[in-house]
Each structure stands twice: as C-alpha cells, then as structure tokens.
Amino acid sequence: MKRFFIGCIRLYQKFISPLTPPTCRFYPTCSHYGIEAIQRFGVLKGGWLTIKRISKCHPFHRGGIDPVPEKKQEK
C-alpha cells in the first residue's frame, strides 16, 4: 500500500509538477514531505500529515521550514 501512494506522488512529481510554476511555500516541498511522511508513519498517519500540510500550502500562510515529525520511540 505504501508503494502505491508513494508511486502516485512520484508520478505527480515527474509528470504534473513540471507543468506548473513552483508554488510550494515550504521546505521540503509538499510532495517530498508526503513521501517522507508515508515512509516514516505508514499510509494512514503519513497520509493524514500530508493532507494537513497541503491544506496549509496557500498564499495566506507564511510557509517556511516544516520537516516531517520524528517517530516517537516506544518504551
């Protein structure tokens, strides 16, 4: 399942993203954030983090550096 969603993001990066001017207000970009979040947390939590991140990527948000959170260590 992870591979499918990461593959969708990579298809977007390769074929759709080059057709539009760069507009992401964050570092790393939202698509890179999505890949890293899904790799680190899985499809559900990583997907949720990605949706939250994309919802903040608009002209009224100042953007900036917003890395994927670290995974909490289990005790």
Swiss-Prot record:
GO terms for cellular component: plasma membrane. Could be involved in insertion of integral membrane proteins into the membrane. Belongs to the UPF0161 family. It is found in: Cell membrane. InterPro entries: Membr_insert_effic_factor_YidD. Keywords: Cell membrane, Membrane. This is Putative membrane protein insertion efficiency factor. It is a peripheral membrane protein.
